[in-house]
Structure formats: C-alpha cells, structure tokens
Amino acid sequence: MKIWIDADAAPRDVKEVVFRAAKRLDVVTILVANAPVGVPANATTVRSVVVREGADQADRYIVSNGEPGDLAVTADLPLAGLLVDKGLFVIDPRGEEYSPATIASRLSMRNFMDDLRGAGVETGGSAPYGPKDKKAFASTFDRLLTKAIRMAETSSE
C-alpha cells in the first residue's frame, strides 16, 4: 500500500499531514510532480518523482504506477476519476473523498462549469485554502489511510 500525491499543486499543509502519517506508520509515500519537490530529510519512506514536463505527465505516472488499495491525493478531477476506476482511495486537499458513487457527478459538474467559463460566464473560483480545509483533509485522510492499511493487511494474509 502506497500513498501517491499529485504534488504540483498540493498545499504545503497537505504534504505536512501526509509526511507525519507516513513517518508514524512507515508507509511509502511518493510525490509526483513536473519539478523537484522538497522531501523531509528524515522521511525515509517518502520520495519524490520528477516527470518530464508536459500536460498530464504526473497524472499518467500515478495512473500507471498506482495499484488498487493505494491512497491518492489530488485536486485534479479527471485524474481522480481514473484512479477511482482503478480501485484507489482518492481524496482532494480539502478533505473530499472521491468514490465510485460520487466521481461521475463531480466530473459532470466540473465539465458543466468549464462549459460556462468557455461561454464567458464568470463562475468564481475556490476559496483560499485555510485551517478548516486542513482539518477536513486530516480527518478524511486519517480515515481513508486506516481503511487502506487494513485492506492491505487483510489481502496479505
């Protein structure tokens, strides 16, 4: 079981929560980005993978290497959809879990909003990332990580 982070746009707070959990639970964690990403020196289970520049290269790497039961962190809905379809647990930096039951409607809404923006309609943006988001992320991340670890332990018996 591994943790995958789509690191190009992951907030620092999210990475800190994941780094602490990875160290505490000895879980392999891989940050994937188009540019080097800092990894704590004492985090022996955390590593960074730099993919070549280009649209969706980090996404392709995570989809190719992630396995069912792994946990992924991404704000990229199309990537989340691919990972959910592959059997990964997926969470966004604000603590929203994506599942087979929710991903289709989230992708549909995203596409609708893209169409509105393409037609010149101002749709606004996301609120700035704040303490409530970090707390929601930490709570959902802990729950999903526990679930993923239990699933990995059960399948290895």
Swiss-Prot record:
Membrane-spanning segments: none
InterPro entries tied to this protein: UPF0178
Pfam families: DUF188
Family: Belongs to the UPF0178 family.
PANTHER family xrefs: UPF0178 PROTEIN YAII
Name of this protein: UPF0178 protein RB974
